[in-house]
Regions:
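A short beta-alpha structural unit
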Residues: 19-20, 187-194, 209, 238-259, ...
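Acidic/histidine-rich catalytic neighborhood of metal-dependent amide-processing enzymes
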Residues: 57, 62-141, 179, 209
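Zn-dependent metallopeptidase/amidohydrolase metal-coordination segment
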Residues: 191, 275-313
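Acidic/His- and Gly-rich active-site-bordering loop/insert found
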Residues: 1-59, 82
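Acidic-enriched catalytic cores of C-N bond-cleaving enzymes acting on peptides and small amides
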Residues: 156-192, 199, 214-240
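Acidic-glycine-rich active-site phosphate/pyrophosphate-binding loop
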Residues: 39-53, 119, 134-145, 297
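His/Asp/Glu-rich mid-to-C-terminal helical/loop segments that flank catalytic regions of hydrolases
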Residues: 79-83, 164-165, 172-176, 216-217, ...
Length: 313
């Protein structure tokens, strides 16, 4: 905010989600677009964020997803305010939050709630130039907790272990065979529990997700999850499950418009980098506008790799 104001940009707003919003030439009706980049990363606050240069590359956790794109968006705002004449289309430039991890696209949801009925287009700047994401991947996310009696590893041997029960549950969940023509995946992402090496665990928790480009496939995956949990519950094994995130799949949207603009972006990227990006699908801030029928595109402005790793560049 301070940097933007130092460039002479006076109107810098924020909302209850802490999105930072810079309106420019906003028009009535749906004669407006939105360009956004997210500020959050997957890394904890304890992660060392020291930028290091290695073989001509800038390396730092979170630098490509999505800090560098956000920095370029700052320069784009400065350029537009200084060089571009106002025209018939307005723009909201946004630095949003909640894109990563369990953020559940909170920033994008709030933006679409506030401005969605006035938008004809949304672009999210995220990741790298070698891909353009023209469609969305939805997801369901859950926190699952298994509880058992537990006890001493020797004296109470034979008592149910929450860790062992969770392992058996995961094994069964990984036996699921997705149905439908779409691409569906599932993942046990985080597991925690137990007390010590000589304790039969009383509690074990897991973060689990399912992803698909088809809404029906997500529902089928969820049904299998709930059926499996019900089957594994006994008097000695308690299982709790809470849905903690839901990213919608694509709604009814003008795909021809999306592909037309994607082709133009692809031509420009190839002209600058010499490499033509591939079209694909992903879970991004665009999930929310696409679910609402607003044509949207996710595109990267940088070259890089290693997203979500400590070696990111």
């Amino acid at each position: 905010v301070e940097w933007l104001q130092a460039q002479g940009i006076e109107e810098v707003l924020s909302d209850e989600c802490t999105n930072v919003i810079v309106p420019w030439n906003i028009q009535s009706g749906k004669n407006n677009c939105m360009f956004m980049a997210h500020l959050d990363t997957v890394f904890s606050e304890e992660t060392e964020l020291m930028i290091k240069e290695k073989k001509g590359k800038w390396c730092c956790p979170g630098i490509g997803d999505d800090t560098a794109n956000a920095a370029i968006l700052l320069l784009l705002i400065k350029y537009v305010h200084e060089k571009v004449k106002k025209r018939s289309c307005g723009v909201w430039f946004v630095f949003d939050v909640g894109e990563e991890g369990l953020g559940n696209l909170a920033g994008s949801r709030k933006l679409m709630e506030s401005y969605g009925n006035r938008l004809r287009w949304v672009t999210s700047f995220d990741l790298y130039t070698h891909h353009i994401y023209t469609s969305s991947v939805g997801s369901y996310r859950y926190r699952i907790v298994v509880k058992t009696k537990g006890g001493h590893s020797y004296l109470d041997f034979g008592n149910k272990s929450a860790v062992a029960e969770m392992a058996a549950l995961i094994h069964e969940l990984y036996g699921y065979q997705p149905v439908g023509a779409g691409h569906t995946t599932y993942n046990a992402g985080v597991i925690s529990g137990g007390t010590s090496v000589n304790t039969i665990a009383q509690e074990c928790s897991m973060l689990y997700e399912a992803r698909s480009d088809e809404a029906e496939a997500l529902v089928e995956c969820e049904n299998y999850l709930y059926e499996t949990l019900k089957k594994r519950k006994t008097d000695d094994v308690q299982i709790e499950c809470k849905k903690i995130g839901e990213r919608p799949c694509m709604g009814v949207v003008d795909t021809e418009k999306i592909m037309r603009i994607a082709q133009k972006c692809s031509d420009l990227i190839e002209k600058v980098t010499g490499k033509r990006p591939a079209f694909g699908q992903a879970s991004t801030d665009c999930n929310i506008p696409l679910a609402m029928g607003i044509p949207s595109l996710c595109i990267g402005l940088i070259e890089g790799a290693g997203a979500h790793t400590l070696e990111e560049w």
